């Protein structure tokens, strides 16, 4: 009961800090050493439901949903930087002892960002198909400073594009596109529904903030072991090369690639659980 009261207090504190809506919602289940699970772009924390079921008998799982995603109230820009700072505050206020960080996609990026910002505060990291610099995945020569002044990465223009998307057909069309990232049609529709329920401005601002933030040098400061679980980028060999290039400055990194699309927790759940289990032992 005392733990629950502390967590509720922390969430209330974060919601009032700087006069803003809280940067994320939190659902806490299980008992044991703490784990913070961060979902990917536009997703609800429910994307981790099955993973939490696997972990909750041994770990206390703090599952986040980022503000503006999947029906949660949005916050002002800079969104992801605010989320980073408030994850650190949340960990400190709740006196979580070196919580393990597990992130998917954008959530992996956030895990790397918070851990490199506060290196002594967090434990091991599990990055599920996420990179320190998304843009370099598509262009190895990408430069964050150049992208910031590139008209194609203008945040307000991207926001406008999202806001102009019609509601009619949004879920159906997005679900079709999501079949490139997950095998199951029901899962694809759920992911599409989370995106439909997300704040359009948040969708635009966060994808740009993610694209123009390069953490490849920052991760040198992370002292804890990092497990990177990748999906197939054209070929498994190419996946290992792409991931290895991005994490080459990490002090302790293990890279494994699944025979999977992007949502590994859905396409290769047992493989994911085994990898996490072995890494956390």
Label every model-predicted segment.
Residues 1-23, 225:
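Bacterial Sec-dependent N-terminal signal peptides
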Residues 62-102, 106, 117:
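Active-site loop/oxyanion-hole signature of alpha/beta-hydrolase fold enzymes
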Residues 97-140:
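Conserved hydrolase catalytic core segment
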Residues 161-220:
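Conserved alpha/beta-hydrolase catalytic His-Asp/Glu region
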